[in-house]
Amino acid sequence: MIHIENLSKTYATPHGRFEALRGINLHIQQGEVFGIIGPSGAGKSTLVQCINLLERPDQGSIAIGGQALVGLGEAQLRNQRRRIGMVFQGFNLLARRTVYGNVALPLEIAGVARAEIPARVERLLALVGLEHLRDRYPSQISGGQKQRVGIARALANDPDVLLSDEATSALDPETTHNILALLRDINRKTGVTVVMITHQMEVVREICDRVAVLSHGEVVELGSTREVFAAPRHEVTRAMVSAATASDLSEATLAAVKQRIDALAAAEPGRAVRLWRLSLKGVAAGEPLWSDLAREFALDVSLVQARVEDIQGVAVGTLFVLAQGAPHAVKDALAALAAREITVEEIAHEPATDRSAYHVAA
């Protein structure tokens, strides 16, 4: 559906050239909900502006439904933009138009026959659950209701793609949940491809099928939402997942575990002591891992911290365990975990923000 190849965008600033996007490659499939996430300054907004060519990339190509956009003239581009609906963070509703009037506006601009507009607007208002507020003005409705108007307006021309640029970041958690449920429902009913631009990992967890993580203008991680939450690879992704799930060790806990490791190592110098982070998903998240490790490899295994989340119907778990045993047994246990497709990281003694870790299995 959306094919982005080698996309780059540079801006001139008083301090020199700034590379907002660098070599972006993304293939977004028809009908999926795709998340683009990253911290502030990662290039998310620039990317969404390039997708609908509000910003022209310096190099690279963008195609939607097989139609290349970069080389189009203004008239052709206007027609193609009607295939792309846009939902904004700030609603951008016209204060002097009613809910009905705001939804009707893009149809009027597109030159839809007057006789056709009422039925199309009523259908859209029913789709977003606002038919009872059709005659209200923006000042008379809530933030969540305003965003529903924005979604209906974005769908007015029956687009193939719906771009959501931080559409929930100004909303409270309950309203955010309701808006995301609405977007998912619209996606299922209409088949529209939804691209979610967000800095909120909670949004990705709730609605997105796949996610791309941006950092400093580059895609640093790409995968299904379940995979990214279960085993984030890049440090930016790890930090965002940890913040969203509280799945990392606190500084105080890590310091206490370090003291325990030192004490165990001093008490039994011939035995290896390791702190592991295990990332599991699906059936593996419910398996009795530490009892298996203790029985099969004669390891003493204690649970430091555990968290299991439901990510779109799949259990995704993060476990921190302290393992002690003969060095060869520890090595064999790591191999056994790898065979179960469990990601294992050995946590060094440094604080969590600076610690070194390595992937034993992915």
Curated annotation (Swiss-Prot):
This protein's UniProt keywords: Amino-acid transport, ATP-binding, Cell inner membrane, Cell membrane, Membrane, Nucleotide-binding, Translocase, Transport
Sites where the protein binds ATP: 38-45
Alphabetical list of InterPro entries matching this protein: AAA+_ATPase, ABC_transporter-like_ATP-bd, ABC_transporter-like_CS, ACT-like_dom_sf, MetN_ABC, MetN_ABC_transporter-like, NIL_domain, P-loop_NTPase
Keyword Transferase found: no
A Gene Ontology cellular-component term: plasma membrane
Record-stated family: Belongs to the ABC transporter superfamily. Methionine importer (TC 3.A.1.24) family.
Protein name: Methionine import ATP-binding protein MetN
